[in-house]
Curated annotation (Swiss-Prot):
Function: Located at the top of the head of the 30S subunit, it contacts several helices of the 16S rRNA. In the 70S ribosome it contacts the 23S rRNA (bridge B1a) and protein L5 of the 50S subunit (bridge B1b), connecting the 2 subunits; these bridges are implicated in subunit movement. Contacts the tRNAs in the A and P-sites.
Keyword terms: Ribonucleoprotein, Ribosomal protein, RNA-binding, rRNA-binding, tRNA-binding
Taxonomic classification: Bacteria, Pseudomonadati, Pseudomonadota, Gammaproteobacteria, Legionellales
InterPro entries noted in UniProt: Rbsml_uS13_C, Ribosomal_uS13, Ribosomal_uS13-like_H2TH, Ribosomal_uS13_bac-type, Ribosomal_uS13_CS
Name of the molecule in the record: Small ribosomal subunit protein uS13
Provenance organism: Coxiella burnetii (strain RSA 493 / Nine Mile phase I)
Biological process per Gene Ontology, one example term: translation
Source taxon at top rank: Bacteria
Assembly notes: Part of the 30S ribosomal subunit. Forms a loose heterodimer with protein S19. Forms two bridges to the 50S subunit in the 70S ribosome.
GO CC annotations, alphabetized: cytosol; small ribosomal subunit
Length: 119
């Protein structure tokens, strides 16, 4: 029996708190909050949950923006900043770090492989 929540097959062998974290947009604290609201013990394995309890989890997860909706929201926020010409948008466009990190000697991950200077 595969448990499906928010379009994601969550692992049935794991505890409810851990299994919920397989959904994009749900971390540890939000998983605990969802379990508390659904009145489910976070240490209960997903395979031991009844269908009613799974429905309660689905309802609670449905209250949050997760998976595709969250990904779309984040990409639209980045696109909006780029269109506005905001500092963060410019940094996104140029593929540079956004949050004030130094780029003279580091930031190789963000900048990519070194490009040779052609003469």
């Amino acid at each position: 029996m595969a448990a499906r929540i928010a379009g994601v097959n969550i692992p049935v062998q794991k505890h409810a708190r851990i299994a919920l974290q397989a959904i994009y947009g749900i971390g540890n604290s939000r998983a605990l909050e969802i379990c508390k609201e659904a009145k489910i013990d976070p240490a209960t394995k997903v395979k031991d949950l009844s269908e009613a309890e799974l429905d309660a989890l689905r309802t609670e997860v449905g209250k949050f923006s997760v998976e595709g909706d969250l990904r779309r929201e984040r990409s639209m926020d980045i696109k909006r900043k780029m269109d506005l010409g905001a500092y963060e948008g410019i940094r996104h466009r140029r593929g540079l770090p956004l949050r004030g990190q130094r780029t003279r000697s580091n930031a190789r991950t963000r900048k990519g492989k070194r490009k040779p200077i052609r003469s």
